[in-house]
């Protein structure tokens, strides 16, 4: 028995829905990029940039410190790779970092901060992943309690949270 127009359209709609779901399912299998480094870099893993997944950041040597911050009432423990290790992985060659947050807030910091201080690209706070609503998933944190110089607006303003990219100039 031949298909009616109605049955034919229903079949086409079902096939279209199934075909549309295939790329979405494949995209779920690909690890999510949480940080992009671009600009003056010598290493890339995507056209013109170096993309990090959370697993890639976790595979770098991890460092922790506990410090007071202006954003929390109690000292917090921050854990993640050193900023200098992230920059080295991307072959950073510039002198200035423009850290860009998910809401497009931008903070500028010298690349040298990563060598002068053990700045952490925190992915954990108090040993737990940081949700976006609490400054995650990534947060540039200086060890404020380790040096009086770091307890100033200059360094607090360089501490971008909800970090999504580093643009190197």
What does each model-found stretch correspond to?
Residues 17-24:
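C-terminal segment of classical bacterial N-terminal signal peptides
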């Amino acid at each position: 028995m031949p298909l009616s127009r109605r049955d034919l359209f229903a079949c086409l709609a079902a096939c279209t829905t199934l075909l549309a779901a295939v790329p979405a399912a494949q995209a779920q299998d690909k690890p999510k990029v949480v940080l992009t480094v671009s600009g003056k870099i010598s290493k890339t893993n995507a056209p013109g940039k170096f993309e990090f997944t959370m697993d890639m950041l976790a595979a770098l040597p991890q460092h922790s410190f506990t410090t007071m911050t202006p954003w929390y009432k109690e000292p917090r423990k921050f854990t993640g790779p050193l900023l200098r290790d992230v920059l080295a992985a991307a072959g950073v060659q510039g002198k200035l970092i423009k850290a860009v947050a998910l809401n497009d807030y931008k903070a500028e910091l010298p690349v040298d901060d990563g060598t002068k201080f053990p700045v952490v690209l925190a992915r954990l706070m108090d040993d737990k992943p940081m949700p976006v609503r609490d400054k995650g998933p990534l947060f540039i944190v200086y060890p404020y309690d380790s040096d009086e110089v770091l307890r100033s607006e200059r360094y607090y303003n360089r501490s971008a949270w909800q970090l999504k990219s580093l643009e190197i100039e």
